[in-house]
Amino acid sequence: EFRTGEVNRVKECTYTPGGKGLNVSKPAAIAGAEVVATGFIGGHAGSYIEEALKPLGIRSAFYRVAGESRSCINIWDKKNQKQTEFLEPGFTVSEEDFSGFEKHFKELVKQADIVEISGSVPRGLDGTAYQRLVRIVKENGKKVILDTSGKLLTMGIEACPTMIKPNGDEIKMLTGRKVNRMED
């Protein structure tokens, strides 16, 4: 049982590389797809992520920046069946960093069949970040799936991704309608 304001003795800890993009990459690699993971990475946590992906069969092609990749602490309270997350802010990416990443990304896209762009972006980037990346993929004649939310999703859609993967909240944001069933 997780108790706030007290010392909590932990019985089990696991460390796994995560984030929306890597959570898509893992089952794809298990299913036999050749997967290349990219994005921004930094510091000791970034090095850990790269090493932890190797045994999963995921090729690491991250773009290194100054700072430390963020960590997420996820506490699972078995007794109450509740999850609590603590998300670090992570590093800030400059426009110069993003321009360098775009060049790196263009080279990776040339080797890809399908590109998934997902999750959030680091501080310092605006809502056009995924729009710019979707355009790069489309300019190379490749398929692109966009799985994000908020301004990144609305602006990303303007670049015409092949597919989007919105959840119920994102569908409501896009259409103004609440979705309760597949028929909606």
Where do the protein language model's features map onto the residues?
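Cofactor-binding loop segments of dinucleotide-utilizing enzymes, especially the Rossmann-like FAD-
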Residues: 40-43, 65, 78, 120, ...
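Gly/Ser-rich phosphate-binding catalytic loop and adjacent alpha/beta segment
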Residues: 63-71, 92-97
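A glycine-rich beta-to-alpha transition motif near the start of alpha/beta enzyme domains, typified by
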Residues: 34-61
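Short acidic, glycine-rich surface-loop motifs adjacent to enzyme active sites
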Residues: 112-124
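Conserved phosphate/ATP/ADP-binding segment of small-molecule kinases
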Residues: 127-184
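Glycine-rich phosphate/adenosyl-contacting loop at the front of the ribokinase-like
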Residues: 1-38, 47-48
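Anion (oxyanion) recognition and catalysis
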Residues: 29, 54, 138
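Conserved phosphate-binding/catalytic loop of the ribokinase/pfkB sugar-kinase fold
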Residues: 75-111
